[in-house]
A protein has these predicted regions:
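Periplasmic-binding protein-like
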Residues: 70-79, 98-100, 262-267
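N-terminal basic/disordered segments at the start of proteins
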Residues: 1-37
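Short, acidic/small-residue loops that bind anionic groups at enzyme active sites
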Residues: 88-115, 122-127, 134, 286-299
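C-terminal catalytic subdomain
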Residues: 289-425
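Short, well-structured alpha-helical segments in soluble
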Residues: 57-70, 86-89, 248-258
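Long, internal scaffold/assembly segments composed of regular secondary structure
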Residues: 220-313
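Extended hydrophobic packing segments that form well-structured cores
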Residues: 372-499
Length: 499
């Protein structure tokens, strides 16, 4: 994927002047050796400058990691550490920063070999707060060389999302459909996140689409589509128009991203789109998303934002689905009740179907097929509703989440992990049966209670750990990062007297 950053973490050791500098240097070397042995050398850079309680050392280390192309930073306390210069480094570095610290290695060397980084990290946290400087501190931030290497590796997807957002432009084509308040998108919070937004009209897109009529690249894209769809290419006559639209959006990305490095899109697909363009855009949305350019439906700007975050963290294809409908009791009784899945058995109250008309990439659908958009075809001529890619989602672990601004421009988020069940939905669209523990309570006391839109970003594995840290780093209050609580862990609005 070319539309997400490559992260290079500069590792800078720091030392208190009353502790041996060599202790911090040797611990840094051991950490780097462990990292390279487990994960390779491409993601990190070992800064040769150890900061020993000196602002001049700090400036030299800062210039060194910048010169070496580092866009993320690990401040490694090899001993107690100098809280002024080490946090000044974090404050001056323009990118995501983490702190971790060295544990004592052996009982045989607790005289000159004792570093007291466990204590020093407390001072570092205090100084970071004084400077109002953000930093990622792992759950267990003090460890041996291998454990600190693992911490840095866990930091990389977090850093990738932060760096990506600081260089992101969301391109939208709207306005949102009438009678669709759910996709209200106050843009102040985007600027608070350093995300750029370019809002265009549907008419701008139509004009550009028409200018791409008879584009010489159309035939090549059609062949790509035929190859991807295979036996699912049931409406071949629509492919040239879809190819023309894909080229239109691709060119718009190229010519409009400006000084930003990464792009996410959100477009309209109703009510006038079908009749004016002559198709529905779902399949094209899915193809661009598979190429690393997430496209959210229905002018869902924060859906596009969430999909991009998910793409950065997972380095995989994402999708955007409605939290859509319940699972019928007869389906549950015949296909799900009493059966053991990846994460065990499920109750009916844990289940829902996630659906969208046909925007999920072919690689995430068990068996895809080109179709008419069934809902639109109920009131429009069938010939203008072609263009959805339909099929049941690939089963396996999943994460549903959303980063959203409230109407008064406050950020909040939710995350829930579960699985997509290997059970046929017997329905239409890009669709799957989702199993999320205690989903009924999560639905009522998070999604409804906090007025979330019905769109959720979908990842095809468990990424809650990284998402939670990204949202904290972005400044979402921890009380507004919701998740599906376990039984007997009540939500603030939950009635404790209900059986």
């Amino acid at each position: 994927m070319k539309n997400i950053p490559e992260v290079k973490v500069g590792i800078v050791a720091v030392s208190r002047n009353c502790f041996p500098e060599l202790l911090a240097v040797n611990r840094r070397k051991a950490l780097v050796e462990q990292y390279i042995a487990k994960y390779g050398e491409n993601d990190i850079y070992e800064c040769p400058i150890c900061i020993v309680e000196s602002e001049l050392h700090m400036a030299r280390a800062l210039n060194n990691v910048i010169k070496e192309g580092c866009n993320a930073l690990c401040v490694f306390l090899g001993n107690f550490g100098p809280e002024i210069s080490e946090t000044m480094l974090a404050d001056c570095f323009d990118g995501p920063v983490m702190f971790c610290a060295a544990a004592e290695e052996t009982q045989e060397d607790l005289l000159d070999g004792r570093g007291d980084a466990y204590c020093g990290l407390l001072n570092a946290s205090y100084a970071l707060n004084l400077r109002k400087t953000k930093a990622y501190i792992p759950e267990n931030p003090v460890g041996d060389a291998e454990e600190c290497a693992d911490m840095i590796h866990s930091f990389i997807p977090i850093a990738r999302a932060i760096v990506g957002l600081h260089n992101l432009k969301i391109i939208s084509f709207g306005p949102r459909p009438s009678n669709f308040l759910a996709c209200n998108a106050p843009i102040q919070a985007l600027y608070d996140l350093h995300v750029e937004i370019e809002e265009n009209s549907e008419l701008d897109l139509l004009e550009s689409f028409q200018k791409h009529n008879c584009d010489q690249r159309i035939d090549g894209v059609v062949e790509e589509m035929k190859s991807e769809l295979g036996v699912g290419n049931t409406i071949p006559d629509i492919l040239p128009k879809l190819a023309q639209y894909e080229i239109t959006l691709s060119d718009w990305i190229r010519t409009h991203k400006g000084n930003r490095k990464y792009v996410s899109l959100t477009t309209k697909c109703w009510p006038a789109f079908q009749t004016m363009f002559g198709f529905v855009p779902c399949y094209v949305n899915s193809r661009l998303t598979a190429k690393g350019y997430p496209v959210a439906c229905e002018v869902d700007i924060y859906g596009a934002l969430s999909e991009f975050v998910g793409t950065c963290i997972s380095e995989d294809v994402v999708t955007l689905l409605d939290i859509n409908n319940t699972v019928p009791k007869d389906m549950f009784n015949q296909q799900i009740r009493g059966k053991t899945f990846v994460e065990g058995e499920y109750a009916l109250s844990d289940l829902f179907m996630g659906f969208h008309c046909g925007n999920t990439s072919a690689c995430k659908i068990s068996s895809c097929k080109m179709c008419n958009q069934r809902i639109m075809a109920r009131f429009l001529p069938p010939e203008v509703t072609k263009g959805t890619i339909e099929g049941d989602l690939v089963p396996g672990k999943t994460t549903i989440f959303r980063l959203q601004s409230t109407s008064d421009s406050k950020l909040r988020a939710y995350i829930a992990q579960g699985e997509i069940l290997p059970v046929a939905t017997r329905s239409y669209g890009s669709i799957g049966i989702f199993a999320i523990r205690e989903m009924n309570r999560f639905y009522r006391h998070v999604l409804i209670e906090k007025n979330y839109p019905h769109h959720a970003a979908i990842l095809f594995d468990h990424y809650g750990k990284s998402l939670y840290e990204v949202f904290k780093y972005l400044g979402v209050p921890v009380g507004d990062i919701d998740y599906n609580r376990k039984r007997n862990n009540y939500y603030p609005t939950e009635n404790p007297f209900i059986d």
